[in-house]
Amino acid sequence: MQLKDSKTLKNLYAAFAGETQAWGKYSFFEAKAKKDGYQQIAAIFQETAKNEGAHAKLWYEYIVGEIGTTEQNLKDSAQTENYEWTNMYRQFAEQAREEGFEEIAHKFEMVASIEKAHEQRYNALCENIQEGKVFARDGGAVWVCRNCGYIHEGETPPEICPVCAHKKAHFEIQAQNY
């Protein structure tokens, strides 16, 4: 029997959904425990969330096979975000409005606009990979090491950070929002 024709595949989808929901829920509970002053309990929620994430990844890989390249994952993510803002949240908002839940309908619409921005961001990042612009900018840029904060000006970041020895992959273009 092929996995695609089996009840086991349905069980894998259910297990993946359950584990990802638990991962999210325990992450929320961790934040609340921290806020309430229970650091040890927060750490246990964090550890359990990490475990649930590992379980989710296990089931996900059975469902989809190997996780794709970063470029493939960006394309997949952009498609997911497009569906969410063009279809899913619009339908959810309509349904909520029909049932008299105006506030929830409005929240669905606001989240849809965020999902649209996510799609645009994923598409731009994919384009950066395709055009070789992730670690190169014509005319130069200010690059910051995400590990230690070292700042480098140039068309590309250094191959190795001269301060902390992390690889080029840890550099990003400096963004100032202050």
Regions found by a protein language model. Give the residues of each.
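Non-heme di-metal
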Residues: 1-178
